[in-house]
Curated annotation (Swiss-Prot):
The lineage of its organism: Bacteria, Bacillati, Actinomycetota, Actinomycetes, Mycobacteriales. GO terms for cellular component: plasma membrane. SUPFAM superfamilies: S-adenosyl-L-methionine-dependent methyltransferases (SSF53335). Keywords: Methyltransferase, S-adenosyl-L-methionine, Transferase. GO terms for biological process: methylation. The keyword Transport does not apply. It holds the Pfam family LCM. Belongs to the UPF0677 family. S-adenosyl-L-methionine binds at residues 126, 155-156. This is Putative S-adenosyl-L-methionine-dependent methyltransferase Rv0281.
């Protein structure tokens, strides 16, 4: 379970979830009809090695990401989610945003793979160990960012707005923000502070996009935590998830930003999956209940 002030690198705790997601993106890229291709996701997995590389090589047919009940749907989800936020950034850039803020950047490689307009600065905020790993892996592959990239080594539970300003962020200029796969790892109070910080720093003609999710019922959540603990104790190839999230009720993101003058659009994940031609998991599957609680939100400030 999480504790106040806990820390991690790319292979532990919350950091390891970035590897899990990168593996899913790499598996999506292996398809004959990928929704998106992240050319660097596989590099991150192979840099760590072990099961992260083996699953890409088909050596772990029993890996969670290979299961029909969860894994196949999760890979679809990551392909769809990545596509959603890629398209969001393209729209924001076309509308004039030249400052991009990636909160809890993890193994996000958009600074390297999206066609940013001239004059764009991408601010990546995350823990220093995570940023170091990403920079070293990308450098070893000769990757070059396609915009000015600025790393900001900060915990989002600390004073990240000041760190962002200290790195050259201009609150008076349009900006585009993203919180992808982040909110579930924040307690409700931290999410409120995060949204408040975005609202305070984002000027006119700015944009924000987040992945939002409703909490599980307390009994269902407790059962999932115990089930996960038991599987890990028995030596299963299980990556902690439920033990890392904060299952706390927060104001829906679209509602929160809408009440503060933003024009927000919320799209249910399952509706987006259908729109991009990917199957929606049934309610009886392991992935089904999680997907049904998930919403993709984008908002603009005029």
């Amino acid at each position: 379970m999480r504790t106040e002030g806990d820390s991690w690198d790319i292979t532990t705790s919350v950091g390891s979830t970035a590897l899990f997601v990168a593996t899913a993106r790499a598996l999506e890229a292996q398809k004959s009809d990928p929704l998106v291709v992240d050319p660097y996701a596989e590099a991150f997995c192979r840099a760590v090695g072990g099961s992260w590389a083996d699953v890409l090589d088909g050596k772990l047919p029993d890996h969670k990401l290979k299961s029909t009940d969860f894994g196949e749907h999760f890979v679809n989800f990551q392909g769809a989610r990545t596509k959603y936020f890629d398209e969001y950034f393209r729209r924001a850039a076309a509308a004039g945003a030249r400052q991009v803020v990636i909160l809890a950047a993890g193994l996000d490689s958009r600074a390297y793979r999206l066609p940013w307009p001239d004059g764009t600065t991408v601010f990546e905020l995350d823990r220093p160990q995570v940023l170091d790993f990403k920079r070293e892996v990308l450098a070893s592959h000769g990757a070059q960012p396609r915009a000015l990239r600025r790393e900001i080594a900060v915990d989002l539970r600390d004073d990240w707005p000041q760190a962002l300003r200290d790195s050259g962020f201009d609150a008076a200029a349009p900006s585009a923000w993203i919180a992808e796969g982040l909110l579930i790892y924040l307690p409700a109070t931290a999410q409120e502070r995060l949204f408040t910080g975005i609202d305070a720093l984002a000027g006119r003609r700015s944009h924000v996009a987040v992945e939002d999710g409703a909490p599980m019922g307390p009994d269902e959540y407790a059962a999932k935590v115990e089930e996960e603990r038991a599987a890990i104790a028995e030596g299963a190839e299980e990556h902690p998830f439920f033990q890392l999230v904060y299952n706390e009720r927060c104001a829906p993101a679209a509602e929160w930003f809408g009440e503060r003058g933003w024009t927000a659009v919320a799209t249910l994940l399952n509706d987006y999956l259908e729109a991009v031609g990917r199957p929606v998991p049934g309610p009886e599957s392991e992935a089904g209940p999680m997907f049904a609680r998930n919403t993709l939100v984008s908002a603009a400030r005029v």
